[in-house]
Amino acid sequence: MTGNEIRESYLKFFEKKGHKILPSASLIPLNDPSILWTAAGMVPFKPFFTGAAKPEYTRVTTCQKCIRTPDIESVGKTARHHTFFEMLGNFSFGDYFKESAIPWAWEFVTEHLRLPADKLWISIFLDDDEAFEIWNKTVGVPAGRIVRMGKDTNFWEIGVGPCGPCSEIYVDLGAERGCGSPECKVGCDCDRFLEIWNLVFIQFFKDEEGNYTPLTSKGIDTGFGLERVASVMQGVPTNFDTDLFREIMDFTAGLFGLKYGVDGRVDVALKVIADHCRAITFAVADGALPSNEGRGYVIRRLLRRAVRFGRLLGIEDPFLHEVSGAVVRQMGRVYPELVTQREHVFRVIRREEERFGETLAQGTEMLNRLIAEARQAGSAVVSGEDAFRLYDTYGFPLELTQEMAGEQGLTVDTDGFGRAMEEQRQRARSARQETDYISGRDAMFKKMREEVGETVFVGYDALEATGRVLRIVQGGKRLESAQAGEEVEFILDVTPFYAESGGQVSDRGKVTAADLEVEIHEVTKPVENLFVHRGKVVAGILKEHDTVTARVDPARRAATCRNHSATHLLHKALKEVLGGHVNQAGSLVEPERLRFDFTHYAAATPEELQKVEELVNRMVLSALPVEAFETSLAEARKMGAAALFGEKYGERVRVVKMGDFSLELCGGTHLRNTAEVGLFKLLGESSVGAGLRRIEAVTGEGALSYVKAKEEQLAEIARLVKAAPHEAVRRVEGLLQTVRDLEAENEALQARLARYQVQDLMDRLREVKGVKVLAGQAAAPDMDSLRGMVDLLRDRVGSGVIVLGSAGENRVNLVAAVTKDLVEKGLHAGKLVKELAPVVGGGGGGRPEMAQAGGKDPSRLKEALEKTYKAVESQLK
């Protein structure tokens, strides 16, 4: 079976078992700062397992795109390690449990994949008798083929939250693939027993004290690795030999005029390139961009490693963007986002390859210098520390350093490299804090929601609502009441306050009753449909169960709505002006301003920004109606609604439509008509990372204030240049031209003065041990002028040492130059100024040919210059 056939067969099998087939979530996790990547099939469903959100379906099956990067250096060298892989899975949220999950897994592998039952082994958690009974009695697996294993391998848990035992299906690949030990069995580190399916039975909740409580609503989370299963079904020794990789590897080999399977060294490089290019292509299509931190650093590191292995195969020009095309051709049918984002992906990869080419040249220069230094020291070894520095700073793999050093007859201290690598890993482990699947605060509010129920949000249609106080919290502790002066968090059963989410800040306002007044500073939503109001009691007493009136600050809400609706117009305008590749990468919507991050390869030109601003304002003047409605995710996609990369949407979504111009999935608050924006004004555009740009803007009263401030600045400039405002630009241009003319005249005078001074200074030329030495004081306004005079003197002298000094108020400049022939005899300008600078209370240094220094004591400049001759004499000894 091909990889595509296995994928399709799995999904259809579970669809017939009542599961909803859902598309893969983005590789960029939604609202989960604890992880960089979606690394398992269950990650998109974590809120359902933790109880933080309610699922649309209780049975789901997916083929999830995944990235894992802890073992990057192993990729290409082992049979199974990958950075990108596909994880098939079937999930139950409070529906079926072991009694169905186990028999279905067995049915699929034996009847649909037709794997021989006598080649299959089962592992279970040590104490999971229930799973044993189902495997043995219901399914019919002999007891001798069911292996009980410990908590370290067969119990799934991550910090506080849901957890449970797991059971795995292994395929026996034959004794010839094993370690030869008579003790070889399931769980052995050799390649004989290959795990293809992991079934996790989520049946406990682990609290902060480490206690395990049975869950009333149990869950199933399974992982069925497509690449591994394909290797078994296709009878090949490694995942790389499956059809999932071979097309990409053969294409890459063709670029180099090579063949896979002939040379082991070539094969490793082809595997690395294919694996890493799959990861890069999918990640960039999902919105990741190369950078120096976070997931962007992972992308950059993978790309550089792939390019370096290309260099080992002899290719110097950018090529990875072409390999990316092979990835799109092979997988675009299953993952249509690859096709729609193809041009964006190619441009990002090509630009990053070119940038790395420049970095690689710098690294090569450094390595050549290290090799030269090792030879001078009489060593034939490049130290492990230096090799690691090349790896860490310039992205040189150890293999490339070894190859280049080997060409020069040197070796590399690989043990030292390994120690340096491990030290960095230890530092990273120390710096990294383990993040629980669900924080203590979120767990508290999840439990609270179970006790008091959810909050009904009415803020789309009303700015005032009557509600009941369900719970009051302070510092994580429940309060029955809060007095005036206290800051607390509390939950209402009904609220008009928008909770901070989707880049939009929360509403502010007041909660009141007869004698009560609470100022609301912030509203959050730690778990789905639970609105937590944080505020200060300024009068009266806030009590549980009291009925109160919640009022949103209308002016603040209106200003926020203006900026949010303008953000949608801006997003669409950027796509119209810059191209369809533009996608939202983040935003901040607050009453005072808006900030919008988007994907683009270069700074927008002033002309492009002007077009964007004009288009947005044209849509404002068009008075487009703004509508918000709910529909299914599938229907919204059919309509062409824009969605945020990395966002995980439920089956029902809210769509915001602005005439026929803009259509986006959005849960924020908006205007009724674009005319209410009033005026849209761009403040600026800047870079926030490679391929990532940022625009800041204001609307309404904020835009009006900005324009008025600019008018006042123009009026002040006009006053200063003594012109009418409409003539100010012409007047300033005239003044600037006058300044340029005067500067040119001044430069000419300075050059003439320098030539006169050079003639006078030549009279100070002396000989020291047969070497011409000139040291003198010059009238030079700055260091650049002084260097220019030194260059003139060096040309006049031909062979010699020149030292010039200039003095200003509490300032001394020194410049020294040594001609090349004398550098070869041991004279060094840098050492010379280091000796002279302390005389004038300063310091400096530089290259053997040219150096400079500064000081603070002009009164001793003559003394320093006179010392030049003895210093040169000393260097000539």
Curated annotation (Swiss-Prot):
<dbReference type="InterPro" id="IPR018162">
    <property type="entry name" value="Ala-tRNA-ligase_IIc_anticod-bd"/>
</dbReference>
<keyword id="KW-0963">Cytoplasm</keyword>
<keyword id="KW-0694">RNA-binding</keyword>
<dbReference type="Pfam" id="PF01411">
    <property type="entry name" value="tRNA-synt_2c"/>
</dbReference>
<keyword id="KW-0547">Nucleotide-binding</keyword>
<dbReference type="GO" id="GO:0016740">
    <property type="term" value="F:transferase activity"/>
</dbReference>
<dbReference type="GO" id="GO:0006419">
    <property type="term" value="P:alanyl-tRNA aminoacylation"/>
</dbReference>
<dbReference type="GO" id="GO:0140096">
    <property type="term" value="F:catalytic activity, acting on a protein"/>
</dbReference>
<dbReference type="GO" id="GO:0004813">
    <property type="term" value="F:alanine-tRNA ligase activity"/>
</dbReference>
<feature type="binding site">
    <location>
        <position position="568"/>
    </location>
    <ligand>
        <name>Zn(2+)</name>
    </ligand>
</feature>
<dbReference type="GO" id="GO:0002161">
    <property type="term" value="F:aminoacyl-tRNA deacylase activity"/>
</dbReference>
<dbReference type="GO" id="GO:0005829">
    <property type="term" value="C:cytosol"/>
</dbReference>
<dbReference type="InterPro" id="IPR002318">
    <property type="entry name" value="Ala-tRNA-lgiase_IIc"/>
</dbReference>
<feature type="binding site">
    <location>
        <position position="666"/>
    </location>
    <ligand>
        <name>Zn(2+)</name>
    </ligand>
</feature>
<dbReference type="GO" id="GO:0008270">
    <property type="term" value="F:zinc ion binding"/>
</dbReference>
<feature type="binding site">
    <location>
        <position position="564"/>
    </location>
    <ligand>
        <name>Zn(2+)</name>
    </ligand>
</feature>
<dbReference type="InterPro" id="IPR023033">
    <property type="entry name" value="Ala_tRNA_ligase_euk/bac"/>
</dbReference>
<dbReference type="InterPro" id="IPR050058">
    <property type="entry name" value="Ala-tRNA_ligase"/>
</dbReference>
<dbReference type="InterPro" id="IPR012947">
    <property type="entry name" value="tRNA_SAD"/>
</dbReference>
<keyword id="KW-0648">Protein biosynthesis</keyword>
<dbReference type="GO" id="GO:0000049">
    <property type="term" value="F:tRNA binding"/>
</dbReference>
<keyword id="KW-0030">Aminoacyl-tRNA synthetase</keyword>
<dbReference type="InterPro" id="IPR009000">
    <property type="entry name" value="Transl_B-barrel_sf"/>
</dbReference>
<keyword id="KW-0067">ATP-binding</keyword>
<dbReference type="GO" id="GO:0005524">
    <property type="term" value="F:ATP binding"/>
</dbReference>
<dbReference type="InterPro" id="IPR003156">
    <property type="entry name" value="DHHA1_dom"/>
</dbReference>
<dbReference type="Pfam" id="PF02272">
    <property type="entry name" value="DHHA1"/>
</dbReference>
<comment type="similarity">
    <text>Belongs to the class-II aminoacyl-tRNA synthetase family.</text>
</comment>
<keyword id="KW-0436">Ligase</keyword>
<protein>
    <recommendedName>
        <fullName>Alanine--tRNA ligase</fullName>
        <ecNumber>6.1.1.7</ecNumber>
    </recommendedName>
</protein>
<comment type="function">
    <text>Catalyzes the attachment of alanine to tRNA(Ala) in a two-step reaction: alanine is first activated by ATP to form Ala-AMP and then transferred to the acceptor end of tRNA(Ala). Also edits incorrectly charged Ser-tRNA(Ala) and Gly-tRNA(Ala) via its editing domain.</text>
</comment>
<dbReference type="InterPro" id="IPR018164">
    <property type="entry name" value="Ala-tRNA-synth_IIc_N"/>
</dbReference>
<dbReference type="Pfam" id="PF07973">
    <property type="entry name" value="tRNA_SAD"/>
</dbReference>
<dbReference type="InterPro" id="IPR018163">
    <property type="entry name" value="Thr/Ala-tRNA-synth_IIc_edit"/>
</dbReference>
<keyword id="KW-0862">Zinc</keyword>
<dbReference type="InterPro" id="IPR018165">
    <property type="entry name" value="Ala-tRNA-synth_IIc_core"/>
</dbReference>
<keyword id="KW-0479">Metal-binding</keyword>
<feature type="binding site">
    <location>
        <position position="670"/>
    </location>
    <ligand>
        <name>Zn(2+)</name>
    </ligand>
</feature>
<keyword id="KW-0820">tRNA-binding</keyword>
<dbReference type="InterPro" id="IPR045864">
    <property type="entry name" value="aa-tRNA-synth_II/BPL/LPL"/>
</dbReference>
